């Protein structure tokens, strides 16, 4: 099984999101623990790892998100733990793999890499999201493209409809 993980899951697991309570943080910690038994999908140009690096520590501490980042970084070339896919830059959509769908036209450009790697993976891995409300309004459009967003902290999605 493969999984795509939005950076906010690491941030919440580190306890660095003010609106995330203990239940949300626990869900993120559990999800990262489960991800260690799956294959984490990343891209060969390191768009995802570069973003993780901005929020995670190579020391692997003090938080669970930091520990996960260090673990993933050390295993990025190990096909037992990582599925590395190629995503193609696109001038308008960000990535060619990102759907040309009007319902997704306003989706956050910085999150498009997660959709692109999920589609490039070929097995429709779930995308884990903790706190980013941009995913909520497009969940049905993504579903139409065979993708599922797993909302680890649904309580943070209140009022996210546009």
Residue ranges and their predicted role:
Residues 10, 48-49, 135:
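A generic structural signal for short hydrophobic patches within well-formed alpha-helices
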Residues 81-127:
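Active-site neighborhoods of divalent-metal-dependent phosphate/nucleic-acid chemistry enzymes
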Residues 14-22, 56-59, 100-105:
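Short, flexible/disordered intra-domain loops and linkers
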Residues 14-16, 51-56, 138-142:
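A short acidic (Asp/Glu
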Residues 1-44:
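Short, well-structured N-terminal submotif of metal-dependent ribonuclease cores
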Residues 44, 119-162:
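Acidic, PIN/NYN-like endoribonuclease modules and their adjacent C-terminal/linker elements
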Residues 33-37, 46-98:
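PIN-domain endoribonuclease scaffold, especially VapC-family toxins
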Residues 27, 31, 104, 138-141:
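Sequence/structural signature of beta-propeller domains
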